[in-house]
Amino acid sequence: MSEHDMQNTNPPLPPLPPEITQLLSGLDAAQWAWLSGYAWAKAGNGASAGLPALQTALPTAEPFSVTVLSASQTGNAKSVADKAADSLEAAGIQVSRAELKDYKAKNIAGERRLLLVTSTQGEGEPPEEAVVLHKLLNGKKAPKLDKLQFAVLGLGDSSYPNFCRAGKDFDKRFEELGAKRLLERVDADLDFAAAANAWTDNIAALLKEEAAKNRATPAPQATPPAGLQTASEGRYCKADPFPAALLANQKITARQSDKDVRHIEIDLSGSDLHYLPGDALGVWFDNDPALVREILDLLGIDPATEIQAGGKTLPVASALLSHFELTQNTPAFVKGYAPFADDDELDRIAADNAVLQGFVQSTPIADVLHRFPAKLTAEQFAGLLRPLAPRLYSISSSQAEVGDEVHLTVGAVRFEHEGRARVGGASGFLADRLEEDGTVRVFVERNDGFRLPEDSRKPIVMIGSGTGVAPFRAFVQQRAAENAEGKNWLIFGNPHFAADFLYQTEWQQFAKDGFLHRYDFAWSRDQEEKIYVQDKIREQAEGLWQWLQEGAHIYVCGDAAKMAKDVEAALLDVIIGAGHLDEEGAEEYLDMLREEKRYQRDVY
């Protein structure tokens, strides 16, 4: 039977009713494509492709959907974005949820409604997972976004000069590229819960109303793909930390070192807490009792005076010890305190944002009280303070090696201000005040943006300075425990070989056992000319390029303000020189490594 005969055996199709013809004439290309796919799917499933089904399924508008993106450094932005997505789905809105590390930056051009929750790192830079999108939007290949509606929630820390800078930058750039705001940007501080909840409620109400105007059919409730779920880490979390015991506190810098770095071991037995190399440990701490007494004496407040803190009525001394931030000054504190001090100099400082930021960075809260005395009630003073927040430390152990323990590498923050010795809140608690077998409240903070390759045969290059070596100890422990075939290369820097070689004997043993294949050390103060890790990177350009050609993953951990930037500049020089690419090509190559998760950074 010929093809012509086969065609003639089918009965003729009835003509389309006028109302269907009218509807079809108004469809654009995207709607025609959708309709074609829908009809084909219906026919393939054995459903009738007749007109009644077509009439029922025919859309009168594009499906109303929202993309919710997060760019997180410590997990807070991800958590807020997850809740926002859940809230929108509960309102019957179709949601596409993604972390920026899993999102193709070029897809931004096709978005119609976008919510972005982003933190800020370093000196106002976007989180690592947002770098590629940030560069695209600010580069010469930036797409037009005139069909996009958006809203941005920024998370930050007001004690830093560039508060919520990443959120502000994205918000501004979206508008410059033609996008329209759904809602004004919100900048949330460390105690972000109330601001984030209000933003989520407002955007959900707005989008629900817009969806109704578009007569969109509410989307069915859907379970997000398994890959987007946060893996359970046991019942303990930031809000309900595990009361762990301190096993060991060992100073691992020499007596003559300018640094005080501690190797901390904590017992997780009975917690069911699990972590992976690259994760961080959240540590809740109490302030120094001596600092609490100093502050109360300066203010003339009776330690037994009761105030509200953490939903309880507590003596102010207890409240300041466990519920309020006392070691990190903020612009909000200085501005709030200035009227009580009634001092012209402090008023001038508070009125000039640039001067204020410098003052906040250099002057602890207690020293503000010393320099500008004032009398406040206990409630008034507490009202100027932020809630105490846990500190996050890169985990320096692998559970494959240490079992129910977790190890940290903690640099104790110590300095003098106007002759008075000061120490960091959490680092001082761990280094000085927490006794062996004492209790420390902890939780695991996942960091999926800083992971070993899934293929353990892939080589890795680890670049860090100071306590930035911490996660690399965990990496090599894990690779050794798995007897991984992949080569490991450590590039580490610190001031002095004799005083600051963190975990020296362990690195030597790893090398002897065949799990540290290459190593380069930069001791910046051991010779007249300062040598840093970026110098070692340039020195080893040909070798690094060869490892990259073999599929190596590069990891950087340490200071975001200077070290990480200098390392990236050195890597670009390697790509230009050894890879024979121009500057633009080198940038694109590094962006490709980022998107392939072969260039990951944990910087702070």
Swiss-Prot record:
Q: What is its EC number?
A: 1.8.1.2
Q: How is the cofactor bound?
A: Binds 1 FAD per subunit. Binds 1 FMN per subunit.
Question: Which superkingdom, per the lineage?
Answer: Bacteria
A single Pfam family it belongs to is FAD_binding_1
Residues in FAD-binding FR-type domain copies? 239-453
Q: Which cofactor does it need?
A: FAD; FMN
Q: Which InterPro entries match?
A: CysJ (IPR010199), CysJ-like_FAD-binding (IPR003097), CysJ_Proteobact (IPR029758), FAD-bd_FR_type (IPR017927), Flavdoxin-like (IPR001094), Flavodoxin/NO_synth (IPR008254), Flavoprot_Pyr_Nucl_cyt_Rdtase (IPR001709), Flavoprotein-like_sf (IPR029039)
Domain Flavodoxin-like, first and last residues per copy = 66-204
Q: Where does FMN bind?
A: 72-77, 119-122, 155-164
Residue positions binding FAD = 327, 361, 391-394, 409-411, 424-427, 604
Q: Does the keyword Oxidoreductase apply?
A: yes
Question: Which molecular function term from Gene Ontology is one that the record holds?
Answer: flavin adenine dinucleotide binding
Q: Offer one example of a GO biological process linked to this entry.
A: sulfate assimilation
Pathway given for this chain reads: Sulfur metabolism; hydrogen sulfide biosynthesis; hydrogen sulfide from sulfite (NADPH route): step 1/1
Catalyses: hydrogen sulfide + 3 NADP(+) + 3 H2O = sulfite + 3 NADPH + 4 H(+)
* Quaternary structure and interacting proteins, as annotated: Alpha(8)-beta(8). The alpha component is a flavoprotein, the beta component is a hemoprotein.
- NCBIfam families in the record, alphabetically? cysJ (TIGR01931)
Relate the protein's function as given in its record.
Answer: Component of the sulfite reductase complex that catalyzes the 6-electron reduction of sulfite to sulfide. This is one of several activities required for the biosynthesis of L-cysteine from sulfate. The flavoprotein component catalyzes the electron flow from NADPH -> FAD -> FMN to the hemoprotein component.
Q: What is this protein called?
A: Sulfite reductase [NADPH] flavoprotein alpha-component
Q: Which organism is it from?
A: Neisseria meningitidis serogroup C (strain 053442)
Organism classification? Bacteria, Pseudomonadati, Pseudomonadota, Betaproteobacteria, Neisseriales
Gene of this entry: cysJ
